Every structure is written in C-alpha cells, then in structure tokens.
Amino acid sequence: MDIPRIFTISESEHRIHNPFTPEKYATLGRVLRMKPGARILDLGSGSGEMLCTWARDYGITGTGIDMSQLFTAHATLRAEELGVSERVHFIHNDAAGYVADEEYDVAACVGATWIAGGVAGTTELLAKSLKPGGVMLIGEPYWRQVPASEEIAQACGVSSIADFLTLPGLVASFDQQGYDLVEMVLADQEGWDRYEAAKWMTMRRWLEENPDDDFAKEVRAELTIAPERHVTYT
C-alpha cells in the first residue's frame, strides 16, 4: 500500500505536502485556540509537519494516518527531531474510510479530501472521529477563476471543472452541510510556489541519480511540463 510513485519521488524532500508554509501552519494553529493536551486526528498527514510543530508549539497530542510509507517514516523522524514523539504518532494506513476508535477534539484533512470523494464526503468521514463540539479542519483547493472549458481544467492537472468549487462556493458548502465556518487561513502564491517549484529540483536530481530506472521516462515527462503548467494555471 503506497501512493503513486511520482509523488513519492517529486515530494521526497518536502516537509509540507500542500501549499501551506510553516508560517501559515503556525497561524492556523494559533487561531484554532487549542488547549494543551487537545487531541488531533490528521487524515493524510504526509510528513507530519502540522502535528509535530503543533505538539511543540501548542502542546497538542495527535495521530496521523497516511498511505505513503516514505512520508510516514519522515513524520516519525520529525517527531523525534522535535522531541515530541511521545505526543504524536504516525500510522502507515489508508486514510480513506478511516474512523478512529476514540473521539478527537480536532479532526483534520488538509489537502487530501480525495480520500472521501471530496469535501462533502470528507466532512462525513471526519465527523465519525470527532467529539461533540469538536472542530473539523479541512484544507481544499478552489478555483480563483473557473476554467472556460474542461480541456483547460484538465491542463491544470485535474479531471474536471467539478473537482473544485470557487471560494464562495466552498464556504457556502459547509453551511449547506449544517456546519458553521468559524475560521479560515488561505494559502497564497508563495506557498504554491514553494510546494510546486520544490518538486522540480527533486525530480531533476532524481533523474541524475537514476538515469536507468524504469520510471525515469515518467519523471522526465512530469519535469518537462510541470513548470509551465504551474506558472500558467496556479
């Protein structure tokens, strides 16, 4: 069980696997007003940066679930590095359909709502692991400008215009599901640049070190199109 290899390769040097920066995560942790000892479940936890830094800075405890063997190993090492390995734990598992045995104060899925088929399915999934009165934390891309055609949407790297909503549409969707939106922190262009552009050097160095790998052709193809796709559509 693992994520597609292109992500394992291209994001192998990432600490954060979405367009948030460390500063954005610090802001998000602060505005959530979590008390020390608050328990967080993070589905699609990646390399664990959110849980590890929040354990260090805000005294939370937590569990992260991720399908990537590499990222889960990185998360465990990061917890040890920051001295929080007794507070946060990371499990290599499929986050799709994952329901915790215990209820959490915060149930999160940041940038991985595909685990439940989108935002609506993810809210339903997270609610099953959330204490009454708890906080649900969801990170989701949105269209700043709706593509004029399905072809343009696919050029952005998604399968359909329907994959994402506009920001007003996304905000309205929570109300439609019966939830109050109580805070918001938005990624910015710098965060998108850091998330996307950091992949390019990683892929280039991987190609230099693995020229005869059977997967090199796919990595080369992605490296060729990724920069122009990013500056055109992000």
Task: Enumerate the language-model features and the residues they cover.
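Conserved alpha-helix/loop element of class I SAM-dependent methyltransferases that forms part
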Residues: N18-P36
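Class I SAM-dependent methyltransferase SAM/SAH-binding core
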Residues: E49-A96
